[in-house]
A protein has these predicted regions:
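C-terminal beta-signal and adjacent terminal beta-strands/loops
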Residues: 237-315
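Transmembrane beta-strands of outer-membrane beta-barrel pores
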Residues: 13-15, 24-30, 38, 62-68, ...
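Outer membrane beta-barrel strand-and-loop segments of large Gram-negative receptors
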Residues: 1-2, 88, 94, 109-172, ...
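Surface-exposed extracellular loop regions of Gram-negative outer-membrane beta-barrel proteins
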Residues: 1-35, 39-45, 49, 54-101, 122-137, 166-175, 250-264, ...
Length: 315
């Protein structure tokens, strides 16, 4: 169960505006072994904006964020991965705070044909819960553990180019440098994530293509390699109905691996149906009565913690 309270204050002075907020979150957990956990965390934040003109703006966000252990990582049960290789929860895990800062710039041309948004992000974790491999006799145990002094520096760039009304190109690039030390190794990782989207929008038609290049994520001692994937779709809209066709190509969804002194392993996801997946969609829209919505005031208190972790989730 989760309770969340949030309050903020906003003001504007000429081209400048700011927002100061404070959130309070209380989490209640009960594991399968009837162990109970109660975590109370604070989430303060500051946002500064400057609107140079109608084409460009800059935003700076600073926050002290928090992360709460999920149920699966707290459960002190053992899952067999392979012979002499196990995963086990850690009941000693605690919530942790981390410092987050982001500087974002946005520019849009007067005619709406060009948009660019570069940003720089830095996060510092005095300590962070990360998956670590431990040697216990002849066995290897994968367990979440507290890792000190985790640094993350990132940059991103997204573009939107619309030379004509019915054609849009949307490339993006993300970079992140992470560094920390586990009991097994010093990690210095460079993440490169790039992709592009193309849209053709002639009259009632919508044709889209998206491609994402391979990338490798790191978390503690564990690396995850995501393969190249792409999708293409065509949609035709007529009055209150639409019919479309989508094609997904994702032959190598992910590969999880680790390599430490005296031990290495890899686990690869193989979903052959995603090598060439085709789906057909038909939609009919109808409305009855009146509806009212306040999109800007909606909040979400949904809790998606199923208690599952990577090790005990079907692949």
């Amino acid at each position: 169960m989760k309770e969340y309270v949030y309050a903020d204050y906003s003001n504007a002075i000429g081209k400048f505006s700011y927002n100061i907020g404070l959130g309070l979150e209380n989490n209640h957990y009960k594991t399968a072994t009837n162990e109970r956990f109660n975590y109370l965390v604070f989430r303060p934040s500051v946002v500064l904006n400057v609107q140079y003109n109608k084409h460009s703006a800059m935003k700076f966000t600073a926050a002290i964020n928090s992360s709460v252990p999920n149920v699966g990582d707290l459960t002190n049960s053992i899952v067999t991965i392979d012979e002499h290789f196990y995963s086990q929860g850690n009941t000693a895990l605690k919530p942790y705070y981390y410092y987050y800062a982001n500087l974002n710039y946005q520019y849009a041309s007067d005619n709406g044909k060009f948009y660019i948004a570069p940003s720089v992000t830095y996060s510092y974790y005095p300590n962070k819960n990360m998956p670590v491999l431990f040697t216990e006799g002849d066995d290897i145990i994968l367990r979440m553990a507290k890792i000190d002094n985790v640094h993350s520096l990132g940059a991103s760039l997204s573009l939107n180019y619309k030379p004509v009304n019915w054609f849009v190109i949307q490339p993006f690039y993300n970079y992140e440098y992470s560094t920390y030390r586990t009991p097994n190794q010093v990690v210095k990782h460079n993440l490169h994530n790039a992709g592009i989207g193309v849209q053709f929008l002639p009259k009632n038609w919508q044709l889209m293509w998206n491609g994402n290049m391979p990338m490798t994520l790191v978390d503690g001692d564990i690396h995850t390699r995501m393969g190249f994937n792409m999708s293409a779709s065509i949609l035709y809209k007529f009055k209150s109905m639409s019919v479309g066709l989508e094609y997904i190509y994702n032959p190598n969804p992910s590969k999880i691996y680790a390599d430490i002194n005296g031990f290495s392993y890899s686990e690869e996801t193989k979903w052959n149906n995603f090598k060439n997946l085709v789906s057909l969609k038909f939609t009919y829209y109808f409305y009855k009565g009146k509806s009212r919505g306040h999109v800007g005031k909606r909040i979400s208190n949904s809790d998606k913690d199923s208690g599952l972790i990577n090790i005990n989730t079907a692949k």
